[in-house]
């Protein structure tokens, strides 16, 4: 019997030791510091890295106002109190930097008494009552004051003018509606770095497909006075007079090589009859009647064509496939037809437009490619750009 009892006692001791080891590993040896109830107990540096307003927040990826905003969705929904009600998110001048070496923030006065400010901030965060500081009064009044006033005064409302670095409105209890408190306070006076992307606005695919017609609708609400978003390599502003003056036609592949430039008379190209203007299949009329639906599909939205190679002055240098300008004008110079590329006849039929019209140099005013009166003023500019800027 004693031989059987000795292993049992050893087993009990071993079980007891194992239970103690298990309990010691489960219960933390160092008790955590008491924090705000309901919040996770993290270290001070970790919470400052997480919730600091000095840089980008880790929670800012859930923000509805973009990256790096100080108001993310948790604070906007009212799930958390305002930022500075947490003691670890308050400005920290007294730990790592001397107050004299700290950069002054705009709109704030320089520190009058740095040691007094530091001592009061330490006392306020610790919650220890402290005798008030009388900066405007002589020390005789402080000595004459009763002792009760020295214990009651700091708990009510410390003087706000002597402490520009602290926001004492936040030392009170957090309000019932933290979002209203945040909005009423305005932006935080932190030295927040400028964001990498000031604002990213997404425009729908349909507005981008319209070649520039849908841009005032899409961008105009965001940026007032926004003209057109047509691609301009030269940086020239969009000319509204050039909007609807050009009439681009589907030409035969020999249309750009014929005419007075090559020594042949233009009379052999018969002008387009006036009944062609009433044809609903005309590309110019289609772009006039339904500009929004066709400019994403047709190769020729009127005005500046979006996907063009632009010259240094910002104007068109070459047109798209199968489209040549109404180049047969008396103001045009010889050799302009070489600038524009010509393509095969199989690439000129778009959306079932089977008829092909030719450019006539002696165009009567009732033809399709009649130029508007204000377009005549723009023609020498296009001639000048195409003549001088022919580099690739």
Curated annotation (Swiss-Prot):
It holds the Pfam family Amelin. It comes from the Eukaryota. One of its GO terms (biological process) is biomineral tissue development. GO terms for cellular component: extracellular region. Keywords: Biomineralization, Extracellular matrix, Hydroxylation, Phosphoprotein, Secreted, Signal. The modification Hydroxyproline is found at residue 37. One of its GO terms (molecular function) is structural constituent of tooth enamel. The modification Phosphoserine is found at residue 43. It is found in: Secreted, Extracellular space, Extracellular matrix. Residues 1-26 form the signal peptide. The keyword Repeat does not apply. Residues 382-392 have a biased composition (Basic and acidic residues). Residues 86-109, 247-280, 349-392 are annotated as: Disordered. Residues 97-109 have a biased composition (Low complexity). Residues 359-381 have a biased composition (Polar residues). Belongs to the ameloblastin family. Involved in the mineralization and structural organization of enamel. This is Ameloblastin. It comes from Bos taurus (Bovine). The gene is AMBN.
């Amino acid at each position: 019997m004693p031989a059987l009892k000795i292993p049992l006692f050893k087993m009990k001791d071993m079980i007891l030791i194992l239970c103690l080891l298990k309990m010691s590993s489960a219960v933390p040896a160092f008790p955590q510091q008491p924090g705000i109830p309901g919040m996770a107990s993290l270290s001070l540096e970790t919470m400052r890295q997480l919730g600091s307003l000095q840089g980008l927040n880790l929670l800012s990826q859930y923000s509805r106002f973009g990256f790096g905003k100080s108001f993310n969705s948790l604070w906007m929904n009212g799930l958390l109190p305002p930022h500075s009600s947490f003691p670890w998110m308050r400005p920290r001048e007294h730990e790592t930097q001397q107050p004299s070496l700290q950069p002054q923030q705009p709109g704030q006065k320089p520190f009058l008494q740095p040691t007094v400010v530091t001592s009061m901030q330490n006392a306020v965060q610790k919650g220890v009552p402290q005798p008030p500081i009388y900066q405007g009064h002589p020390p005789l009044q402080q000595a004459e004051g009763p002792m009760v006033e020295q214990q009651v005064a700091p708990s009510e409302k410390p003087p706000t003018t002597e402490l520009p670095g602290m926001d004492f409105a936040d030392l009170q209890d957090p309000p019932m509606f933290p979002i209203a408190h945040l909005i009423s306070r305005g932006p935080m006076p932190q030295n927040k770095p400028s964001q990498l992307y000031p604002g990213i606005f997404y425009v729908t695919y349909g507005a981008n497909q319209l070649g520039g017609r849908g841009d005032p609708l899409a961008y105009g609400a965001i940026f007032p006075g926004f003209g057109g978003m047509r691609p301009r390599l030269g940086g020239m502003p969009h000319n509204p007079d050039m909007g609807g003056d050009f009439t681009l036609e589907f030409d035969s592949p020999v249309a750009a090589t014929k005419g007075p430039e090559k020594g042949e008379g233009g009379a052999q190209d018969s002008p387009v009859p006036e009944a062609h203007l009433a044809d609903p299949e005309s590309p110019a009329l289609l772009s006039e009647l339904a500009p929004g639906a066709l400019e994403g599909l047709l190769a020729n939205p009127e005005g500046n064509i979006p996907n063009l190679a632009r010259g240094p002055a910002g104007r068109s240098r070459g047109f798209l496939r199968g489209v040549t300008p109404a180049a047969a004008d008396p103001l045009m110079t010889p050799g302009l037809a070489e600038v524009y590329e010509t393509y095969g006849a199989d690439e000129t039929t778009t959306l079932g437009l089977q008829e092909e019209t030719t450019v006539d140099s002696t165009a009567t005013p009732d033809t399709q490619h009649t130029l508007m009166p204000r377009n005549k003023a723009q023609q020498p500019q296009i001639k000048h750009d195409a003549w001088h800027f022919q580099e690739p």
